[in-house]
Design a protein with these regions (language model features):
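Conserved Nudix-box catalytic region and its N-terminal flanking loop in Nudix hydrolases
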Residues: 47-88, 92, 183-211
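Solvent-exposed residues in well-ordered beta-strands and their adjoining turns
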Residues: 40, 122-124, 255
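Short acidic (Asp/Glu) patches
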Residues: 83, 98-105
């Protein structure tokens, strides 16, 4: 019988305690659980990029995949597993990590029934330091692009197509991007992609929105919405300084109130 907090609380009746002591945990087959992380960031050209790892073992040996791994049963939660895997692959500890969806098709992994809890991690521009984990041959940041055949992932190492990815990871990535495009219209997700959340211009935030949405936005309307939703509500505060750009712009600071919304 597992020593859970409920058992230690002393709230069990003698009958329930006897039931738990005699319970056979092998009565039902159990799937394994993995945490897979869609790690998104921006390159210097403000293009949306994703971290992929090249698998070093079977199945799908040599194929590109999302960073992730098995949850250590009885030792961590699936969210803790996602944070651990993200840190092992990137060295990032404080990313905006959000649960995306649970993928549980019984045939998604040729080894056994594996349930994947997928997460989206938004990494500030310029802060992603790639390092392949123990079970990967390589790790690379790819630019996400689209052509007539669908989504591609491009880097100096070549072009990877959706169908070239391991498992059902193309489906996971598509869902993550679709969800981000929806959320960015009403949630502060874009702030987590800023290079410096403590000192940024409206134009930087607008560029991120345009990249995610893949469309041009009107600056006047964007500024109006930004001031209304963030400055007037105290979630962002103006700084008494301007940027060093050719046309200096007012700089802003993301407050702790807005940071706590992501915790």
């Amino acid at each position: 019988m597992r020593e859970s907090a409920y058992l230690k609380s002393g709230q069990l009746s003698a009958e329930e305690k006897a039931f738990l002591e005699s319970y056979d945990p092998e009565k039902y087959k159990k799937p394994s659980v993995t945490a897979d992380v869609v790690t998104l960031t921006l390159n210097p050209e403000d293009q949306l990029c994703i971290l992929l790892i090249k698998r070093g073992s079977y199945p799908y040996k040599g194929k590109w995949a999302l960073p992730g791994g098995f949850m250590e049963t009885d030792m961590e939660s699936v969210t803790q597993a996602a944070k651990r895997e993200l840190y092992e692959e990137t060295g990032v500890k404080d990313a905006s990590l959000r649960q995306l969806y649970t993928f549980s098709d019984p045939d998604r992994d040729p080894r056994m029934h594996v349930v994947s809890v997928a997460y989206t991690a938004l990494i500030p521009k310029g802060s992603l330091r790639v390092r392949a984990g123990d079970d990967a041959w390589d790790a690379e940041v790819f630019r996400i692009a689209y052509d007539v055949d669908g989504m591609t992932f491009q880097s100096e190492k070549g072009i990877v197509r959706e169908e070239d990815l391991a498992f059902d990871h193309a489906r996971i990535i598509r869902m993550a991007i679709k969800r981000l495009r929806s959320r960015i219209k009403y949630e502060p997700d874009a702030f987590w992609l800023l290079k410096n959340k403590k000192e940024f211009a409206i134009s930087e935030l607008k560029a991120i929105h345009e990249t995610i949405l893949n469309e041009k936005l009107d600056l006047a309307n964007f500024r109006k919405a930004f001031l209304r939703d963030y400055v007037e509500t105290g979630r962002v505060k103006p700084l008494n300084k301007k940027s060093n750009a050719k046309r200096p712009a007012m700089l802003y600071d993301m407050t702790e109130e807005l940071v706590e919304e992501e915790i």
